[in-house]
Amino acid sequence: MISGILASPGIAFGTALLLKEDEIVINRKIINIKNITKEIERFFEGRRKSIQQLTEIKTKTKEKFGEKKESIFEGHIMLLEDEELEQEVISLIKEKNMSAAAATELIIEGQAKALEKLKDEYLKNRAIDVRDIGNRLLKNILNLNIIDLNNINNEVILIAKDLTPSETAQINLKYILGFITDLGSRTSHTSIMARSLEIPAIVGTGNITKIVKNNDFIILDSINNQILINPSHKLINQTEVIKKKYLTKKNQLINLKNLQAITTDGHAIKIGSNIGNVEDIKSAKKNGAECIGLYRTEFLFMGRNCLPDENEQFQAYKTIAELMKNKSVIIRTMDIGGDKDLPYMNLPKEENPFLGWRAIRISMDRKEILHTQLNAILRASAFGKIYILFPMIISVEEIRILKSEVRKLQIQLKNNNIPFDKNIKIGIMIETPASAIIAEYLIKEVDFFSIGTNDLTQYTLAVDRGNDLISHLYNPMNPSVLKLIQQVINVSHTHGKWTGMCGELAGDERATILLLGMGLDEFSMSSISIPKIKEIIRKTSFSSAKKLAQKALTLPTNREILNLVENFVNH
């Protein structure tokens, strides 16, 4: 039996798909003249397989995204069919006695470097495509295992070292029964994705990829924190009983979906859902979300080879606004960087990406990206109750610049007779100690705050939440983090405004009563967490929650705070 960190509740039975590709090892020795024909054949066979794979991906991309995105892979296929590429590779094999793989690598890398030297930004970015195509071609020449995430077409439990946002953006998620990873934490991307999909996940197992083999039968039990590999029929039957009880309780909680989160003494709280795409709205509604407290727009930018244009973004935002039927939808501008990469943007490799060029810093430097997104949001605001949310704000100067950009775009839309909400609300993420400390200045510039506890905790405690060596130090209920949260809430209330929370702490059952007592106005979380959080709030009095929070904020350690909360809940 293997265990890890409980990331998303549930129980799944299924076969394992191990996301572990073979490493490319190229023989750069001079080949025997007798093997030249064989190496040329290897090149042609590798190219044939690559074209076949890309043709399948192209077809599926057209079905999913339409002809515009299909053309990207058409270009990839044309590059593979290029006669010049073929002639140059064969020439190196024949004249330099190079292996097919070594010759291909040399030509592909030469093409990529030539593109990188060009001044044209679009052409420079094509170097990424060339290397991607070359990587596929090399693996097929060497007959290595290639896992095409787009081509998963049967139900599996996905096993991986870790999963990046760009990887999960490619997966046909309807076939994923659950996630198990070597690395990760409750706030890692894989965990957040699993909760969004309402599928079980256990992360941080340490070495699951070294133990599980493809097609092993797996029981993923993230209720009792156990992973069983090729279990007996007896264990399968026992776990099915546990799953049935869990689903019964889950269905009972779903009955709360149409009820408000009101305390026993009449204090109402707004409960929202965090989403990453239009498809997540179904889960949000099913679980009783009263609003969308966070729309992570960066997922619209992932799993593709180019930036989404204004109309594509507009259609996505408009659809969500209409589906929510005049309930508020908070749209956060693109939060790329840190652990979220876009290969086609050629983001620089940084020593400390979480402290580097990310989120609003990219948008402010690349105004064309910011303007395209803001225009799409403003246009969509005519179709619902949309708010704008800017991430990673650390100064008054930043928010003033951004508000100025919004005003300029509003004037342009007005001049072109394009409708938009003239009174659209603007808020900022409080996710750095800097923004929390100067909240009294920032609140004068905006309509609301949204606290991002994942990054706020990471930056306050100087703990990389993705580093397993120090993950035990990551605790959003640390006294320092709680004091910052309380300060932010108090400042907003003093100025007659409100504060929400969209970090994972908002959906943590241990923190619900504490945050309620601290005066948090809106809780936004993975949809799967909403029914349980509603139940807790509806069973609690606001007056007793306030007393609990006041006491908790006087305690000096994580353990004392947690003990206080647990004693309150159990009595």
Curated annotation (Swiss-Prot):
Phosphoenolpyruvate binds at residues 296, 332, 454-455, 465. It is an enzyme of class 2 (transferase). General (non sugar-specific) component of the phosphoenolpyruvate-dependent sugar phosphotransferase system (sugar PTS). This major carbohydrate active-transport system catalyzes the phosphorylation of incoming sugar substrates concomitantly with their translocation across the cell membrane. Enzyme I transfers the phosphoryl group from phosphoenolpyruvate (PEP) to the phosphoryl carrier protein (HPr). Coiled coil: none annotated. It comes from Buchnera aphidicola subsp. Acyrthosiphon pisum (strain APS) (Acyrthosiphon pisum symbiotic bacterium). Gene3D superfamilies: Phosphoenolpyruvate-binding domains (3.20.20.60), Phosphohistidine domain (3.50.30.10), PtsI, HPr-binding domain (1.10.274.10). Keywords: Cytoplasm, Kinase, Magnesium, Metal-binding, Phosphotransferase system, Sugar transport, Transferase, Transport. Transmembrane segments: none annotated. Its cofactor is Mg(2+). The reaction takes place in three steps, mediated by a phosphocarrier histidine residue located on the surface of the central domain. The two first partial reactions are catalyzed at an active site located on the N-terminal domain, and the third partial reaction is catalyzed at an active site located on the C-terminal domain. For catalytic turnover, the central domain swivels from the concave surface of the N-terminal domain to that of the C-terminal domain. Belongs to the PEP-utilizing enzyme family. One of its GO terms (cellular component) is cytoplasm. Its EC number is 2.7.3.9. Mg(2+) binds at residues 431, 455. This is Phosphoenolpyruvate-protein phosphotransferase. It catalyses: L-histidyl-[protein] + phosphoenolpyruvate = N(pros)-phospho-L-histidyl-[protein] + pyruvate. GO terms for molecular function: kinase activity; metal ion binding; phosphoenolpyruvate-protein phosphotransferase activity.
